[in-house]
Every structure is written in C-alpha cells, then in structure tokens.
Amino acid sequence: MTAKDILFDAEARAKLKVGVDKLANAVKVTLGPAGRNVLIDKKFGAPTSTKDGVTVAKEVELEDAFENMGAQMVREVSSKTSDVAGDGTTTATVLAQAIYREGLKNVAAGARPIDLKRGIDLAVKDVVAELREISRDITGKKEIAQVGTISANNDPEIGELIAEAMDKVGKDGVITVEEAKGMDTELTVVEGMQFDRGYLSPYFVTNSEKMDADLEDPYILIYDKKISNMKELLPVLEKTAQSGRPLMIIAEDIEGEALATLVVNKLRGTLKVCAVKAPGFGDRRKAMLEDIAILTGGTVISEEKGYKLENATISYLGQAASITVDKDNTTIVDGKGQADDIKARIGEIKGQIEKSTSDYDTEKLQERLAKLSGGVAVLNIGASTEVEMKEKKARVEDALHATRAAVQEGIVAGGGVALIRAAKALDATNPENEDQKTGVDIIRRALEEPLRQIVANTGTTDGAVVVEKVKNSEGDYGFNARTEEYMNLIEAGVVDPTKVTRTALENAASVAGILLTTEAAITDIKEDGSDMPPMPGGMGGMGGMGGMM
C-alpha cells in the first residue's frame, strides 16, 4: 500500500482554501456580460477559448495534491449545477468560494464548524423558498428568447433561434445542437415522428431523384418478429390491395421470400408498399413500436399479446397522413391515433423520466417523448473557424439547458439581484445558537458575491457601492452590467431561470459545508523517480557493436 501524507485542522483547511481560490479565481472572470474569456491549452490542436464556467473548472488540475482536493470539491459544485440546471456554473463557484471563505474566518475565530453548517443549511432552505415565491412563469416566446440570450453570453441570435425552436416543437420537444457545414447558423425542424431506419430495399423508392419512398395516406403494419414466410403476410396484403391504399410495414426484419414478393408486387404496381426494420433494440424496441402504434392508431401484432400475423385485419393497422422513407430515416407525419391515447402515453413516459436514474435512459425517454409530442428541431451552428464553432456550440447548449430550466420553474431577476432580494427571508430564520446564527450571516454575505463579481468584471464600477444601492431598492430593480445603468431588470430582459439560481446556491452550500467541517486531509505521497529500481543486467557486450560501423 502506498504511503500517505496527512494534514490536520487549520493547516489542512488552509491548503484546501488555496485550491478552492485557484479554481474559483479562474472561473469567476467569466461571470456576467462583461466577463472575459479563458484560453485552455490542448495537447493536440488549437487552444480552446471559452466563457463557460464548467469548461474552465473541468480543466483545472493542480500539482499540490492537497490544493487539488480543494479545487476538485469546487469543480463538483460546477459540474453538478451544470448537470441539473445546465447553467449557473460560475455563479455556483462564486457562491461556494464566498461561503467557504467567510466560514473559515469564523472557524479560525472559534466557531463550531458543525453549527456553522447547520446555520448555512437553514439559511439556504429559507432563501430557496423565497426564490420560489418571487419566481414568475415564462409566458411567451419573447421571454424564452431573453433567457436564451442571457445564457448564451448576450447573443440575441442564439436566444431567438432557441425561442423559434421551442415554438416549433413545443416545450417538451427534442432540440439537438449540431455543427453546420457552412458559416450560417440555422434551424431545421423535422415534423412528425422520425426514427433511424431506412428502406430494406432500394426498389421501394418512389422518387428516384430524391431516392426516397413517399406514401400518402398509408396503412401501417407493426409486427414485433421477423417476417420471412410470405404465407403469413398474404392475408393482410390482399386486404390492403383491395383498399387501394399504400402499405408501410415495420417489423424486426423482413427477409427471403417475403421481401422478394413485396419488391415484385411494388415493381408490378400491384401494391404500393415499403418495408423498414423496427427502431431500437430489446425492450426499447418494444416500447418504440408501442409508441408508433399509439401515434398511428394501430396495434402491435405480437404473439405475446395473442395476435398472429396471418389473422391480422385492416382494423389492426395504423394510419397516417404521409410517410417518407429514405435510406437512413423514416418519418411519419400526422399519425391518426386518438389524442387521449397519445396524451396518456406522453404522461406515462414523463413519469418514467422522473423515476429514471440513468442519464442514458433519460435521454432516450426524452427522445421518445419528443417524437410523440410533435417533432425534433435541429440547431445547425455555423462559424468561420473550428475554434469559434466549438465555443459557439457550447454556448448554444448552455442556453438551451437554461431555457428548459426556465420553462420548468420560471424566472427571477438576473444580475445577482434575485439572491439579494431572497436574503430578506433570513430575517425570519430561527437558528438554535450563536454559531448557527453566524452560519445564517455567512449566507447573507455570500448572496451578495455574484453581484460584486459581475460588477468587478466590468472593471469600471465599485462593487460595494452597487451592492448597497441594489439592497436599498426593491423588486426587480438592479444593475445592468451591459449598459452599466440601474433599471428594472426583468423589463430589460436580464433574467435567470429560478432552477439555475436555486441549484447554484444549494450545491455551493453543500460543498462549502463539507469543506468547513473537514478536520483532516489524506493524500498519497508522491514517489520520487530516484527510488526506481535499476535496469536489469544481461545486455553486456553491446558496447562491442561499435566495430560493426
């Protein structure tokens, strides 16, 4: 076992604080509209320029192991806030640094760390309740655009694009961010349900120019097994041919005789047909087939449910206004399913998302939800250089997360004002003793820190003066760092999602509390290279090879 180095009490906390400060100081220069960029060296390729707090935090790795522990604890604040709310990572880091700094002063003065932490937790609980109280719901496209603009570092183009995307696919719709081929940033929307399976044979194509199959007002056969025998498929084919409408077949696979017969019928013009494999795998495939059935008003023909393919009738088939199939994707537009059934299915998937503990499962469930809700929007991000494109793409992803957070829990005044307004809730907090009261006061002071830092980053105004002026005013009145004027921030579009502000404070207090109650720190002792064992012998005589030259 490797030997360990241990530091205790004040010495340990001092080392941890150095690490906390190094990381926080690198991150907090990015805060607010006047925040600066941070340049990050990459082993391969050009350096990355970013104004995203969590990206900076993830790059910080310190040489001193004890300092590094402090830095990594605060990095956790940033990462967790990003995971939950998608934005507010810099605010969370600034709050964590302030709470730890103020807490350490009081620990050094003799306060009990455990009571300080209890006071901090009490205060945070009351401030969060007040934030929820002053929060207001997002009502329209304009407010969505404002949130997107702020989170994308005051880029109105990105804010407008996100608002447009949400308008097109709904608040539950899937919006993906991709790199564009050119310099323009644009929005494309895929209407209806799309899944990544193309036609099983190019002979199904109806438009040879576009190389896709277009089916108007088709019936849809949904089967959860392979189809290789034509005999079991024949009854439903005959019934569809009599109706004169096209047929779309979605099955685990179609092969051999069955596929050949479908192709022949299509080429002869007997039946307009197209076949694709079912999307997904395993249990997810079953769920997606059920989604398609509900969307189109059909039934999944499954022997598990007691249905057999040879007994299938027209009533088992789904219907849609149109289906387009290319070599990679199938898009079902305007499925004819019952609105109540689709609504119930959406509710069921939302319930699964809430219970899900896996990020991957949550992502897949959200994709299914969007496909049922009405489409997928793709934001194609363009830029002149790869460095700019990556930076812009990261900003768009942040803005998208923040906008979703705003839709979930509403918005509060931005610019650090909401935290200062929420501090009034601390007047009613009931700490049990003097040290807990000190913990409450630590939070009261820390809540001012984001505004101080936003002002400090402008480089032109004194933070203490601005904080006092904002504290002495009411409502949404605050300092707009972009124009360096005092105004109603919500009317000016300077807003933050409540979820982002709340999560930043909760995570900052949690990690700062752990650091304050730390009494010892343990790390591996670095091994010196001089202690390495000597190279094994046995290669003697190599010196004589000089004569071979």
Swiss-Prot record:
EC class: isomerase
Coiled coil: none
InterPro entries: Chaperonin_Cpn60_CS, Cpn60/GroEL, Cpn60/GroEL/TCP-1, GroEL-like_apical_dom_sf, GROEL-like_equatorial_sf, TCP-1-like_intermed_sf
Entry keyword annotation includes Chaperone: yes
Entry's EC annotation: 5.6.1.7
Annotated Gene Ontology cellular component terms: cytoplasm
GO terms, biological process: protein refolding
One Pfam family here: Cpn60_TCP1
Residues given in the record as ATP binding sites: 30-33, 51, 87-91, 415, 496
GO molecular function: ATP binding; ATP-dependent protein folding chaperone; isomerase activity; unfolded protein binding
Subcellular location: Cytoplasm
Catalytic activity: ATP + H2O + a folded polypeptide = ADP + phosphate + an unfolded polypeptide
UniProt entry tagged with the keyword Transcription regulation: no
Keywords from the named record: ATP-binding, Chaperone, Cytoplasm, Isomerase, Nucleotide-binding
SUPFAM superfamilies tied to this protein: GroEL apical domain-like (SSF52029), GroEL equatorial domain-like (SSF48592), GroEL-intermediate domain like (SSF54849)
Primary subcellular site in the record, as a coarse category: cytoplasm
UniProt record similarity statement: Belongs to the chaperonin (HSP60) family.
Subunit structure: Forms a cylinder of 14 subunits composed of two heptameric rings stacked back-to-back. Interacts with the co-chaperonin GroES.
Function of the protein: Together with its co-chaperonin GroES, plays an essential role in assisting protein folding. The GroEL-GroES system forms a nano-cage that allows encapsulation of the non-native substrate proteins and provides a physical environment optimized to promote and accelerate protein folding.
Name of the featured protein: Chaperonin GroEL
